[in-house]
């Protein structure tokens, strides 16, 4: 992986035009200042020139993909806001909906006219009841291209689909310390540990978050019973397309949506969090988010993000966002690491820091409807021949110590 340059220029025409008009306004005000302010050397005028220069630099110079003035404004807003209220926005109570001729009950969440549903993807060792499930691949993998095909389903157009993968490292102690994993049954954390002979099973869970704007699907809604029925139809169709390829898929109910919220937050307690410029500080440690350079989004990179060679990392949350750009699917990715201490530089090598946007990165991974994208990062087109896959196995063997006495 290779990180992009820390500093750059944001020279889009709307931005340059806006900055030019602001500079003209500043200089006009400076030139009309009273003579008592000008003194003998046009002090007010040169102060205006300096202010205009500073505004221009802050508006067009970008740092890690965001302009300096935007990063500062976002950080100040997050720092002054209540993290609990910010992260809880959109996490409204969901309702269960079943179509008239549908088979599954799907949980649907609504907020500000936007809808969200969730699909859980598993390794499928025990297929869902009532389904003739078989796995075509010996290794459970989620093909990203197959997920991207669900963005447009006949008359239904989805705003985006997020692939959210949560991996918790460590043994029984690490699992019990994470309050977000209470829904994972206790028997799943049992392990036999002996001094000098310890094998720890990492646990991974993967969800697909489907986002829909009803205003873009007026014709589709008119052909169905309700707004929820339209999203449920798209959810069921994507489940049928994915189930049995190389993994198992099932829709998430309303009660399970709350559990997904807790799992994605990991050990992050919103009411005890403090947004920082480079990380989130909370009572249980640090949460640090990075975005991935678009050209580096490959199967190997996604696997490396989930399993960093760092004992400090306890939980990893990887989000791959699929959207439609000029008629073709585009993808972007970011990752969040939870650690007891600040992350070493080796873990962040090749990644781009989400400076000033740490709280937005956490909220963007939650299955909560939003009126506009909370996190805008560089993306690339998803090509038809991209063999991009994401592992979805729930248990990953990870040796954490040497074997003694063999």
From Swiss-Prot:
Q: How does it sit in the membrane?
A: Multi-pass membrane protein
Which ranges does the record mark as transmembrane? 9-29, 43-63
Task: Report the record's disulfide bonds.
Answer: none
Q: What is its main location?
A: membrane
Entry's InterPro entries?
A: EccE_dom (IPR050051), T7SS_EccE (IPR021368)
Q: Where in the cell is it found?
A: Cell inner membrane
Q: Name one GO cellular component term.
A: cytosol
Q: Which UniProt keywords apply?
A: Cell inner membrane, Cell membrane, Membrane, Transmembrane, Transmembrane helix, Transport
Oligomeric form and interacting partners? Part of the ESX-5 / type VII secretion system (T7SS), which is composed of cytosolic and membrane components. The ESX-5 membrane complex is composed of EccB5, EccC5, EccD5 and EccE5.
> What family, per the record?
Belongs to the EccE family.
The record's function comment reads: Part of the ESX-5 specialized secretion system, which is responsible for the secretion of EsxN and a number of PE_PGRS and PPE proteins, including PPE41.
Q: What is this protein called?
A: ESX-5 secretion system protein EccE5
């Amino acid at each position: 992986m290779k990180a992009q340059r820390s500093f750059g220029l944001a020279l889009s025409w709307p931005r340059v035009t806006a900055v030019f008009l602001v500079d003209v306004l500043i200089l006009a005000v400076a030139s009309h200042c009273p003579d008592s302010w000008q003194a003998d050397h046009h002090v007010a005028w040169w102060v205006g020139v300096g202010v205009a220069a500073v505004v221009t630099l802050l508006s067009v110079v970008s740092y890690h993909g965001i302009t300096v003035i935007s990063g500062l404004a976002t950080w100040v807003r997050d720092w002054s806001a209540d993290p609990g209220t910010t992260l809880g926005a959109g996490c409204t109570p969901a309702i269960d909906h079943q179509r008239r001729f549908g088979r599954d009950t799907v949980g649907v969440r609504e907020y500000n006219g936007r809808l969200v549903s969730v699909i859980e993807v598993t390794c499928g060792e025990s297929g869902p009841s009532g389904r003739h499930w078989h796995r075509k691949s010996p290794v459970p993998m989620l093909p990203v291209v197959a997920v991207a095909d669900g963005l447009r389903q006949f008359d239904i157009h989805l705003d985006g689909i997020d692939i959210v993968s949560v991996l918790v490292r460590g043994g029984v102690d690490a699992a019990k310390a994470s309050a977000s994993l209470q829904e994972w049954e206790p028997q799943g954390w049992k392990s036999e540990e002996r001094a000098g002979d310890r094998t720890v099973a990492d646990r991974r869970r993967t969800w697909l978050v489907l986002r829909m704007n009803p205003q873009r699907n007026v014709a589709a809604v008119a052909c169905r019973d309700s707004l929820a029925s339209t999203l449920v139809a798209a959810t069921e169709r994507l489940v049928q397309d994915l189930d049995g390829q190389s993994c198992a898929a099932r829709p998430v109910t309303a009660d399970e949506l709350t559990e997904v919220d807790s799992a994605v937050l990991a050990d992050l307690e919103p009411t005890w969090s403090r947004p920082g410029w480079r990380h989130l500080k909370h009572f249980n440690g640090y949460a640090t988010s990075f975005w991935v350079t678009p050209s580096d989004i490959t199967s190997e990179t996604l696997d490396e993000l989930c399993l960093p060679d760092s004992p400090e990392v306890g939980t990893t949350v990887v989000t791959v966002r699929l959207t439609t750009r000029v008629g073709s699917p585009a993808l972007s990715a970011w990752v969040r690491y939870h650690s007891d201490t600040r992350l070493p530089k080796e873990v962040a090598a090749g990644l781009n820091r989400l400076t000033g946007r740490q709280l937005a990165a956490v909220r963007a991974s939650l299955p909560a409807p939003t009126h506009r994208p909370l996190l805008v990062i560089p993306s690339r087109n998803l090509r038809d021949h991209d063999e991009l896959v994401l592992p979805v196995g729930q248990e990953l063997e990870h040796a954490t110590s040497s074997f003694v006495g063999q």
